[in-house]
């Protein structure tokens, strides 16, 4: 039938790793799961995607917060060239404590926030120690998220992440610059989304 030939991809997770789920995630998960089931009942091929937030400032905050608590961990040794531990240096309970503490401190301490921003940048540039920590954060968080979603009877076909888009970003940024969509403003590369607002170049 025509309905069975239609593919629907539904993003209804939106959880952030290293952070606990809250009531907003409950709403989107239940509504999304309902839409997916209704679509399947109607004959559509539905694909559920959790779409994890794993590549933003919260990662830099966790890394900075962990370094403040355990500065002697091998992940922070600039001269270390060996294999990193397979077991995470934190539990999910500790991880969920690190983030809010680091986030709160970053709002009061500009230097601390800048350290977290730099840690985020270094992670996104592939710094080995930070990538190893990111893998630990992902493993611990996803295990806990799957347990929580299972308790809600919510399931996903795909566990895609923000970081999955990283390989495409450099070319996309260059294309936006080449085509005049992106411009620098106060040291940041900006894309104006309001088409009625002229670019600074036009003023």
Regions of interest found by a model, annotated:
Residues 1-203:
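NTP-dependent nucleotidyl-transfer catalytic core
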